[in-house]
């Protein structure tokens, strides 16, 4: 079972952002419009090495995560010692 978002979760990684966009087949420009950041900013975020984020970048990562989860029903899966990180699309609720 995948972990759900909690305060302890790290920010989503650049690879997770790229993977989610690939799964959804959306461009950096489309995602940028949704989270109100420039395509150039997304290019930098997706190319940045993993590591600590300053408050501004963490806010952008959090906005991307919220948009992907709420708007596109993406689920981010965080490493737990037995599995690595990943993304998947949530199933729609059954009637």
Language model features: what each stretch is:
Residues 2-23:
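A short, Lys/Arg-rich alpha-helix, primarily the initiator
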Residues 17-33, 94:
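Short basic helix-loop element that most often maps to the first helix and adjoining turn
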Residues 26, 37, 73-74:
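Short glycine/serine/threonine/alanine-rich loop segments
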Residues 30, 41, 60-63:
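Residues in the helix-turn-helix
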Residues 36-56:
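Recognition helix of helix-turn-helix/homeodomain-like DNA-binding domains
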Residues 56-76:
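DNA major-groove recognition helix of helix-turn-helix/homeodomain DNA-binding modules
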Residues 73-95:
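Helix-turn-helix/homeodomain-like alpha-helical modules used for DNA recognition
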